[in-house]
């Protein structure tokens, strides 16, 4: 994940991923070196999804651009989290070992269905 000036993946890993999710990031302008490696990943077959109300220069390279309404990205994030939980894709061992308040978080996203997020975003 790349965001405010840093990331959790190496440039080499970005070149070898299957999917790239840019959420609120115009990496092409803000992180040009990272974007150079991202482009190698796209050339290697990665699919890119861009989530941003703006049609940025980065989003023009995306396979899918989700142009959410300004201020609705939290609803989208909560709906995605709810789907991950409902699909059983949560790493329960990691959560038990490394987090606090998960049950409260899980309850807080329960009302954010995909239908709700689609309607407001």
Question: What residues fall within each predicted segment?
Answer:
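Cofactor-pocket helix-loop regions in the catalytic cores of large enzyme subunits
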Residues: 1-121
